[in-house]
Amino acid sequence: MSNTSSYEKNNPDNLKHNGITIDSEFLTQEPITIPSNGSAVSIDETGSGSKWQDFKDSFKRVKPIEVDPNLSEAEKVAIITAQTPLKHHLKNRHLQMIAIGGAIGTGLLVGSGTALRTGGPASLLIGWGSTGTMIYAMVMALGELAVIFPISGGFTTYATRFIDESFGYANNFNYMLQWLVVLPLEIVSASITVNFWGTDPKYRDGFVALFWLAIVIINMFGVKGYGEAEFVFSFIKVITVVGFIILGIILNCGGGPTGGYIGGKYWHDPGAFAGDTPGAKFKGVCSVFVTAAFSFAGSELVGLAASESVEPRKSVPKAAKQVFWRITLFYILSLLMIGLLVPYNDKSLIGASSVDAAASPFVIAIKTHGIKGLPSVVNVVILIAVLSVGNSAIYACSRTMVALAEQRFLPEIFSYVDRKGRPLVGIAVTSAFGLIAFVAASKKEGEVFNWLLALSGLSSLFTWGGICICHIRFRKALAAQGRGLDELSFKSPTGVWGSYWGLFMVIIMFIAQFYVAVFPVGDSPSAEGFFEAYLSFPLVMVMYIGHKIYKRNWKLFIPAEKMDIDTGRREVDLDLLKQEIAEEKAIMATKPRWYRIWNFWC
């Protein structure tokens, strides 16, 4: 089979080096210098000698690269996204902490209480455990792609490149909407969390303004500000969850102030599953799947951050593998403790909202067993978790806007990136949308946010499913173009079958969400309730079909043999890369078996 792609046939003037096509125009661009942090800096970005002038100049736009007008639209997009002006300032420790603790938020700390009430303790382990296997496989697939293509937009660009332009348009717009809506939601959640200490509601707007300003300021420090903030936030969350697990073991064994061994008492009375009939118990398990998926939202941020990391080839695989620990240690063990310490019929869980810190099973477990002071500490951590998600919202949404603009899905102005690597227009638009949080003082607050959330409620599932399909399609393209896995510096431990499993689980969760939307737990069916839970599904379908009609593109997938699997690669010298991989394998072969197994999975 020939290794010559359609891109090479249409562009014979381009250079070819070790099997990789390199556009000759890259050789004529203005000179650049490569500093130790890995960022490409144009000569016109050097300092003027005046700090004030340098500060003003830092907001000026990085000159967009020029591409050959004779190239196809897809080829232009591939080149533009590969030459991202975003800065490479995220270090290994940043990615590690983002992977371990970045997604720990209200879904686990508060939302797990609702899941416990509707499903029971056994349902918690089934729901989070099953969802965790999907998340692990998805992140491993994303890690493989992100190491090869650390390009602008990350996985939001892969969908357009490896699946289909219409799929990328619909999926990526929905992903942008998710984070656009999340910012005001999290700011309001933070202002509600403060009520735990009996704060007067009249100060709600003041707290909204304070939290909004704090999140915006962090992001104005660029990716370095985001990375440092997430490092601190995640470290605090991780320490708290580990501390709770240790405390939970002590309390369960009778070491608390109230004394008395608990063991598996609450698994027998009131029971392991909520509900009186098999049908009710099954519905409870389905509802837990929905909450579990929500709690894992943000797990894909490691892939988005890859394009701004110093050394993605080494840092991204390490960070991706940390997901194993987040799932097993921070989710499964903490939820096991919750199920052992709090019965699913506890009155504090009834009628609680997803942002009510008093309804956090972590707080309830501590309060119930007579420990004073710690509930306030946990509430502070919940507040930090909420602000962490808000911080990630501006980061993810602004970068997604840049990628959408580079793919011609948004006006070109949204691709504005200044000399400090900040997507200023994206940050400004996302921050402005966050001002909707001031509706917190309105009586219609709940209704407004329910419908805002409905617009992107299933966004994470679409994103995760899209990543799995991208990985499957990429592997098919390698085979179709006569390329081997030996040119991959990092291969997903779960392989392509892991992506098939992840896609299967995403479909199962869509079905579970549909079932719960039609037949809600503890409530009667209603059209309003259904669309609040499932509105984003028809919305994505409308965007997908609408784009197909507009572009008159009726192909389901880009043919595997025509996919561009070269532009944007981190390493262009495949022979050198293969040699380095062989050396790394030889070194690993000298290690003990237990270490090799550990390194493969973790």
UniProtKB/Swiss-Prot annotation:
**Which signals induce this protein?**
Expression is repressed by ammonia. Expression is induced by polyamines. Both GLN3 and NIL1 bind the 5'-GATAAG-3' motif within the GAP1 promoter to activate transcription.
Q: Which residues form a coiled coil?
A: none
Description of post-translational modifications: Active permease is phosphorylated. The addition of glutamine causes rapid dephosphorylation and inactivation of the permease. Ubiquitination by RSP5 and the RSP5-associated proteins BUL1 and BUL2, leads the addition of poly-ubiquitin chains being specifically formed by linkage through the lysine 63 residue of ubiquitin and mediates ammonium-induced endocytosis and degradation in the vacuole.
Cross-link Glycyl lysine isopeptide (Lys-Gly) (interchain with G-Cter in ubiquitin) mapped to chain: 76
> What is one term from the GO cellular component aspect held by the record?
membrane
Q: How does it sit in the membrane?
A: Multi-pass membrane protein
Q: What's a single GO MF annotation on this record?
A: beta-alanine transmembrane transporter activity
InterPro entries under this entry?
Answer: AA-permease/SLC12A_dom (IPR004841), Amino_acid_permease_CS (IPR004840), Amino_acid_permease_fungi (IPR004762), APC_YAT (IPR050524)
User: Per the record's keyword annotation, is Ubl conjugation included, yes or no?
Assistant: yes
Q: Which residues cross the membrane?
A: 96-116, 122-142, 166-185, 205-224, 238-256, 281-298, 322-342, 377-396, 422-442, 452-472, 492-510, 530-548
Gene Ontology biological-process annotations: amino acid transmembrane transport; amino acid transport; polyamine transport
Keywords (A to Z) from UniProt? Amino-acid transport, Cell membrane, Endoplasmic reticulum, Isopeptide bond, Membrane, Transmembrane, Transmembrane helix, Transport, Ubl conjugation
Extracellular side residue ranges read: 117-121, 186-204, 257-280, 343-376, 443-451, 511-529
Localization per Swiss-Prot or TrEMBL? Cell membrane; Endoplasmic reticulum membrane
Query: Which of the residues are on side Cytoplasmic?
Result: 1-95, 143-165, 225-237, 299-321, 397-421, 473-491, 549-602
Against NCBIfam families, the record matches this protein to: 2A0310
Job description of the protein = General amino-acid permease involved in the uptake of all the naturally occurring L-amino-acids, related compounds such as ornithine and citrulline, some D-amino acids, toxic amino acid analogs such as azetidine-2-carboxylate, and the polyamines putrescine and spermidine. Senses its transport substrates to set an appropriate level of transporter activity at the cell surface. Required for FLO11 expression and invasive growth.
The family this protein is said to belong to: Belongs to the amino acid-polyamine-organocation (APC) superfamily. YAT (TC 2.A.3.10) family.
Q: What is this protein called?
A: General amino-acid permease GAP1
